[in-house]
Amino acid sequence: QFFGARANLAKCLLYAINGGKDEKFLDKKTGKPMQVGPEYSPITSEYLDYDEVLAKYKKMLDWLAGLYVNILNLIQYMHDKYYYESAEMALIDTDVRRTFATGIAGFSHVIDSLSAIKYAKVKVIRNAETGLAEDFEIEGEFPKYGNDDDRADNIGVWLLHEFLTDIKKRHTYRNSEPTTSILTITSNVVYGLSLIHISEPTRPEPIS
């Protein structure tokens, strides 16, 4: 298994809304919000439109998948170059099945966020100086992931399929088989610190 940590799909959603700019981290040279993702046009409406958000999110997911696979390919190549695990490989059958292990952090958070945008009204609170979304207000009720509600669960099915399809479009190291895992606990504690929330507009905290 070529292990490769995980991708923060919740942060990716914020990049889709803010045109690839990071709402928390500044460029050291310019002092302005860092342009991390592709410089797409940000969403400027007062309330988020589901179709508009989804269209931009698809593009940002595809960019993230490409970056993710490229970095993991480099990591696995350098690992084999400088520390090939020959002792462990000696115990493996002749026909080796290699998997390319990707992962997702913030899965349920993205589902709840998209669900809030689709089924309720989400108002964007923008930074007065940068114009970037930095908080959200929700008006109305919306289905949440983990409650056996197909409206939320179907968003999760779409999200997993979309991201894994984007992963599979890329060449993986040694033609390994792309897989993904939906991770919890430690990854969501760390990754939550880099986020502002949509479905739960609070200060940064661990995401579920």
What is each model feature region?
Residues 1-141, 208:
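Structured mid-domain segments that build the active-site/substrate or prosthetic-cofactor binding neighborhood
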Residues 59-63, 80, 84, 147-195:
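Gly/Pro-rich turn-and-neighbor structural signature
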Residues 142-146:
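Short, glycine/alanine-rich amphipathic alpha-helical segment
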Residues 197-207:
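Single conserved hydrophobic/aromatic residue that forms the stacking wall/gate
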